[in-house]
Amino acid sequence: MAPQTKRAAETPKLGVQKAAVIAAAFLSAITAGAMANISMISVPVFMDTNTNPNHMIAQWSRTYHYGHIILPGICVGTCGLYAFSALRSNKNWRRYALAGITTLSLVPFTWVFMTPTNNTLFALEAAGNVSDLGYVQQLVVKWTWLHATRSMFPLIGAILGFTGIMADLER
């Protein structure tokens, strides 16, 4: 009779902390992808198909609205998972803390760099009958570049989280 191998001893233990990091890194990547989609697909469609500045502002406003409902909550939850992981990790706590801070950094980036453009677009929407398509396009393109830059924060957080979990699993 052949001896039974202990498969459980060969498989690295996942645990709650590592599962939290995997979830956080996954959520960071999903957030980055959703944000990049807006800049790389949605807004270019607005630019290619709109000839009416009021319609373009309305589309931008609705895109902002739905993104604002979903993405900040995911970002905060992701940061919480990274914080939990940092507190529970012995060796990679700095990497997990940095992943959380990096992911959450999109919030101050938004306040500092994007709020003026957002406010201008919202003011144009509230004013109603806007006639300068070129000006609206210029604002939307500026917002798109800022938004694409902002989407890098959760992407970097995801990379830090994934590299941290890979380092943990190697030990």
Swiss-Prot record:
Catalysed reactions, as listed in the record: emodin anthrone + O2 = emodin + H2O + H(+)
Membrane topology: Multi-pass membrane protein
E.C. number: 1.10.3.-
GO molecular function, one term: monooxygenase activity
Glycosylation sites (chain numbering): N118, N129
Any one of the GO CC terms: membrane
Pathway: Secondary metabolite biosynthesis
Alphabetically ordered keywords of this record: Glycoprotein, Membrane, Monooxygenase, Oxidoreductase, Transmembrane, Transmembrane helix
Domain of life: Eukaryota
Stated role: Anthrone oxygenase; part of the gene cluster that mediates the biosynthesis of the dimeric xanthones cryptosporioptides. The pathway begins with the synthesis of atrochrysone thioester by the polyketide synthase dmx-nrPKS. The atrochrysone carboxyl ACP thioesterase dmxR1 then breaks the thioester bond and releases the atrochrysone carboxylic acid from dmx-nrPKS. Atrochrysone carboxylic acid is decarboxylated by the decarboxylase dmxR15, and oxidized by the anthrone oxygenase dmxR16 to yield emodin. Emodin is then reduced to emodin hydroquinone by the oxidoreductase dmxR7.
Stated name of the protein: Anthrone oxygenase dmxR16
Organism name: Cryptosporiopsis sp. (strain 8999)
